[in-house]
Amino acid sequence: MITLYVDGDAFPNLLKPILLRSIERLKIKTYVIANKKINIGESCHVEYIIVDTLADEADNNIVEMLEEGDLVITADIPLADRVIEKNAHAIDHRGELYSVDNIKQYLAMRNLMESIRES
């Protein structure tokens, strides 16, 4: 059975009720992982995990817990890359699938934009 991991640090508030309804309807075991309290709602299918505020601590926790075939919702492109390396699936909060075919392009664009911002 698939497990869902939500990178809660940047998950949009407007989508939380929609996500919770889907979790309830599909009865998907879900972990919401963040470095602060994030609440998408109460459900017997949802477990909240608060990690230290160290850089990438939530990401590291997600990667450590996930198994092949699991699904991660994240806007964090480096995390999506790590998820794909573990043969799991990653989508952003709009439902855009990160894949082996497109993740390196997303990473390159992210890195380019970061270097432009730092200039």
Give the residues covered by each predicted segment.
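Nuclease catalytic cores that cleave nucleic-acid phosphodiester bonds
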Residues: I2-S119
